[in-house]
């Protein structure tokens, strides 16, 4: 695979007004994508966005570029990333474009593409778009220019799709649910899905103004959700991130239920129903208690690198249907082609209703081990992880943990940092071991 000049692991992302998140680059990117995709078949591309104010600027620039290349754009308005994956498939569009920086602050944004199948673009198509970006821009004849249209029923279509994943014989009647939409793309969808399934819904983080996405709310900051759940005596709280591909839950006692626990609940329910194909994919950061809990059920578990892209790649490699991260990316491939916060929350809620159990009771099967993370800065040059002393102390700590914990030493890909993570049932022991390793890393 050729080295990427513009595309990262999740499309193009950065600070608005700074290359590559500028109107002129978005125009050129739309044109380059249009030139490549025009040779593929259909001549319409879906464009969705989250609620950042810069989305207006970027969608207009992308549409102009696509039109110049002869492709039409169909706008969905604010829409979760997984909704664009779904709608691209059902509209039989040539591709889907999402304008979002996920859980980042409002002043960041990004542009990523879905294929006609609602999956990541094939490498050869991405490489062709990159090559086209370095070509001079041209314009098709006037009669061949693309058009722009708006999909007025996109929200309703996705709401019905989400509801369709919830068992028809079950209802959320008598459940009080607090929904935190992070002032993001789920604000007009998630609360309505829950209401239409019978729940009493209290909304927070559902008044986007273009500048407040992910600000002290959503999956990356659940304090407000925890307080609201306790205040209104709700059964459960749901927190999504800005583009709706992450889910963190809160039980009726105000406790956080993270992606690892959500993943286990869904896996156990799929096993009971006979729907679990193969095993579960987690990441290097997945809590050891998840691995042990799955093992008790006889469910295979493997770890991918951190990042939902790598989880998905491992799932496809193994032919498995379920994977996720402790940060709340949950991928259920027999329901959608990418991580989907609303779909994941409905899977957990259906387990609660089916067995008449609280979220606290369901999550108690995975009592998370304390994780201690220490970042150690080094002076560049040799990688401390290659030193004999670091390898020796790592081996010593592994032996001390005796299979009841684990260590993870990683070199940052962006800074001169070594990340030291120790995890075990005994939090004090984890802290002690992490500091022991960090001291040796600093000395080397």
UniProtKB/Swiss-Prot annotation:
Cross-referenced PROSITE patterns: PGM_PMM (PS00710)
InterPro entries: A-D-PHexomutase_a/b/a-I, A-D-PHexomutase_a/b/a-I/II/III, A-D-PHexomutase_a/b/a-II, A-D-PHexomutase_a/b/a-III, A-D-PHexomutase_C, A-D-PHexomutase_C_sf, A-D-PHexomutase_CS, Alpha-D-phosphohexomutase_SF
PTM: Activated by phosphorylation.
Keyword Magnesium: yes
Entry-linked SUPFAM superfamilies: Phosphoglucomutase, C-terminal domain, Phosphoglucomutase, first 3 domains
Cofactor note: Binds 1 Mg(2+) ion per subunit.
Reaction equations catalysed: alpha-D-glucosamine 1-phosphate = D-glucosamine 6-phosphate
Keyword terms, alphabetized: Isomerase, Magnesium, Metal-binding, Phosphoprotein
Domain of life: Bacteria
Family named by the database record: Belongs to the phosphohexose mutase family.
Function recorded in the entry: Catalyzes the conversion of glucosamine-6-phosphate to glucosamine-1-phosphate.
Full protein name: Phosphoglucosamine mutase
